């Protein structure tokens, strides 16, 4: 089952309608996601594990976690190109040179799970890949 707990906080998050979600997996995985309301039922994820991001769910999105090493971006782009998936925007975030990094890619087409798996396996420095469809 799933255990869910809600806590109200007085912490100033820079916006009146912010949610901070901490999720723990049964095998020790942990992620912290911060999002805010944009109004009209729309939301934006603004932070994942300390990385500032902008994910609204209004575009197909591929998210990677990887080490900041040469060739990672090229391999991800190569795998998407092989599948004829066009990149509309791409942003990279890193904690430091050669350190942990996140890449957010918006695409014109959905990224199927099999393609996301190919992306993950395309370079040893890629540690995690998640494909999100439009919501």
Language-model regions, residue ranges each:
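A conserved regulatory-domain signal marking ACT and ACT-like small-molecule sensing domains
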Residues: 1-135
């Amino acid at each position: 089952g799933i255990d869910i707990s809600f806590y109200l906080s007085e912490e100033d998050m820079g916006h009146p309608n912010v949610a901070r979600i901490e999720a723990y997996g049964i095998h020790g995985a942990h992620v912290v996601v911060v999002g805010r309301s944009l109004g009209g039922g729309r939301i934006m994820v603004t932070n994942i594990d300390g990385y500032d991001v902008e994910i609204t769910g209004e575009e197909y999105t591929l998210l990677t976690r990887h080490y900041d090493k040469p060739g990672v971006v090229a391999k991800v782009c190569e795998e998407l190109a092989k599948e004829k998936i066009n990149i509309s925007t791409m942003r990279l975030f890193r904690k430091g040179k050669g350190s942990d990094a996140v890449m957010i890619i918006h695409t014109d087409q959905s990224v199927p799970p099999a393609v996301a798996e190919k992306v993950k396996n395309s370079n040893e420095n890629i540690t995690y890949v998640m494909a999100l469809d439009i919501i």
